[in-house]
Amino acid sequence: MIIELAKNYGFCFGVKRAIKKAEQIKDAATIGPLIHNNEEISRLQKNFNVKTLENIQALSNEKKAIIRTHGITKQDLEELRKKDIEIFDATCPFVTKPQQICEQMSKEGYEVVIFGDENHPEVKGVKSYVSTKAYVVLDKKELQNIKLPNKIAVVSQTTKKPEHFMEIVNFLILKTKEVRVFNTICDATFKNQDAIKELSLKSDVMVVVGGKNSANTKQLFLIAKTNCEDSYLIETEEELKKEWFLDKKHCGISAGASTPDWIIQKVIAKIENFKIN
């Protein structure tokens, strides 16, 4: 059986930057998980004493706080700045961009449509920068019964599929006078999604490695599953089952943007140890 990695996969720029920052700072607390990968979060806690707190209210005697890659709300940031604590911002620059756009467009009188999951921490943070009105949607159908204003700005959660974003944009163009569209989908998302599509079309089994709470990993899995029925989403090599690979000729592997190479290599090694001819 051939084992092939996607052309683009794994750690993105923003995650690499955050991990490096956390390792250098040490002895700190992150507000929410730094990234969506439980194994890497455990490694940072064990080796660098970087612990995870659920929210700002959980801070007690910590001297250093790291803002997660997904960012935090504007209100939480203001609250954090009032505390006697050193702040290190690990928000991904691709996430900071829609925050800034929302703030500026609001000042100019635009209401904002955010294409994304309203429960995702990134989207909560982005929405908090809107001072007019924000509409968080996952489908154009959610906009059909809304009385839209004459001026709308549109941004996307960084990990969403571009074609779905364009469905929202095309709907709005037909419904309102002025639409300002900002492409806030991360470049790494484009590349990883294109790569897994290409690989899954020629594979008869696919393994996607990443946190099951990771939005970008779930998107990769959905693309793989569309093209390759026998696609599996795992967090570690412990979840692999030999029967997945029996009678298979081509195994494709990809990984989410928060998945470190050391986990991916363990997955490959275990699949190789199954010794599927």
UniProtKB/Swiss-Prot annotation:
Which keywords does this chain's UniProt record carry?
A: 4Fe-4S, Iron, Iron-sulfur, Isoprene biosynthesis, Metal-binding, Oxidoreductase
The note on the cofactor says: Binds 1 [4Fe-4S] cluster per subunit.
Q: Which InterPro entries match?
A: LytB/IspH
Q: Does the keyword Oxidoreductase apply?
A: yes
**Residues that, per the record, bind dimethylallyl diphosphate:** 36, 70, 120, 214, 216, 258
GO terms of biological process kind: dimethylallyl diphosphate biosynthetic process; isopentenyl diphosphate biosynthetic process, methylerythritol 4-phosphate pathway; terpenoid biosynthetic process
User: Key word Metal-binding present in the record?
Assistant: yes
The residues the record assigns to binding isopentenyl diphosphate are: 36, 70, 120, 214, 216, 258
Q: What is this protein called?
A: 4-hydroxy-3-methylbut-2-enyl diphosphate reductase
Q: Which organism is it from?
A: Campylobacter jejuni subsp. jejuni serotype O:6 (strain 81116 / NCTC 11828)
Q: What is the lineage of its organism?
A: Bacteria, Pseudomonadati, Campylobacterota, Epsilonproteobacteria, Campylobacterales
